[in-house]
Amino acid sequence: MKSIVLASSRGIGKGIADELESISSEVIRTSSSDLDTSDIDNVKDFVSKNKETDILVLNTAGPPAKDFYEIREDEWLKYYNQLFYSFVYILQNIKVKDGGYIFLMTSFNIKEPDPKLIMSNCYRLAFTSILKSLTKDFAKRAVSCINIAPGPIDTDRLRNLVDDVDELGKTLPMGRVGSTVEIGRFVKSIIENDIKYLTGVTINFDGGHSNYVI
């Protein structure tokens, strides 16, 4: 079984790739140095070398926190590629084999938008819509599509967004932020237990932090 895990040199991607090592015969990991999803030529080169897989984990770093009126045109275009079009191209050109899985890593902010993370909110939500739209076609080949929407997880990105992760954790329902290992184990458990009927869903992974119902 082959797995491709994007942005897996650290953070959530690494947590997933580390767990998949024990159940996958081949795990292809990428970092920003060998796959920059904001560079479509780089994405095309990667895809040309990776035509198919059993497990595809679509994951990428997020944009900086910025006020809407301060976001430049070049930033809109960069993160359009990084968060949206790169995934479109990958999904169009890397075949996920029958019985496989597609995991999309987004954010709980797609349902509860953060005004400082507008680029992340809108582009992640747009691709979530694409994956949902394709779910029924993928289901015909027993390919399950699962969107995981993490809340505060202990990653470099979170540490760049907040001043004190430990203090943030104290304000959360569980008294802590989540760990990348937890997400990795969750993904592994779905694959390892051959859970197929769970598809076309967005799963909150936020320790009860979000306020929305569905």
List PLM regions with ranges.
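Catalytic loop of short-chain dehydrogenase/reductase
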Residues: 101-140, 152-153
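Short C-terminal tail/terminal secondary-structure segment
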Residues: 188, 199-214
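N-terminal Rossmann NAD(P)H-binding glycine-rich loop of SDR-like oxidoreductase domains
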Residues: 9, 13, 17
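Catalytic Tyr-X3-Lys loop
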Residues: 62, 69-89, 103, 120, ...
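A conserved structural motif in NAD(P)-dependent oxidoreductases
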Residues: 172-183
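A glycine/serine/threonine-rich, flexible loop-to-helix segment
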Residues: 140, 147-171, 213-214
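Short, small/polar-rich loop/turn modules that mediate ligand/substrate recognition or access, typified
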Residues: 139, 144, 198-200
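Conserved NAD(P)H cofactor-binding loop of Rossmann-fold oxidoreductase domains
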Residues: 57-65, 208
